[in-house]
């Protein structure tokens, strides 16, 4: 556990979540303006709601050097046409051009080297707070599954963030609770560049 112009690379099929066909629609960003919409939503969730300190190249937008190499899944609210959910996808060819996966800024991925040509990285997933009932994330997952199948990719990686405002105790508890049953086999394990001292930080409380 660690402490710490748009190019299209795949083909995601526009779709609609079957139980909410009139409310939401899924698409892939095809223009810089659509990517900017995703970045604005990310800023709203990560900076304004969760308090992340972001280094923004454009005010009010969460962006970094990986964005222009990624594909961006979008879920729009049909009535307003606004983006209310997004997922960022970095396919292997784009990661090669970029020179790395985002995860490699946090972890050593040496043991996944033989998987790289079939390995997709996802991240920057977020949903507008008014639409977290389950339908939007289900639609994003459906789009991600379709993306993987259509492009013949086999492996999915990515980082998930856990808040550290309590000094890392909850993050340590999360690792303690999930590690015994969910650690990858040793030949696939990745190691953090800035390791969280979970042995010292874990408490008797349940992770949240």
Feature roles, as predicted:
Residues 11-15, 22-23, 50-52, 97-99, ...:
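Residue-level signal for well-ordered alpha-helical segments
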Residues 9, 30, 53, 61, ...:
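Histidine (H) residue identity feature
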Residues 4, 14-84, 88-91:
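Short amphipathic alpha-helix that is part of the acyltransferase structural core
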Residues 8, 33-36, 82, 96, ...:
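A broad, structure-centric signal for solvent-exposed, well-ordered loop/edge residues
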Residues 10-13, 22, 30, 57-59, ...:
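Generic preference for well-ordered secondary structure
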Residues 1-9:
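Eukaryotic low-complexity, non-globular regulatory regions
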Residues 92-208:
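Acyl-donor binding region in acyl/amide transferases
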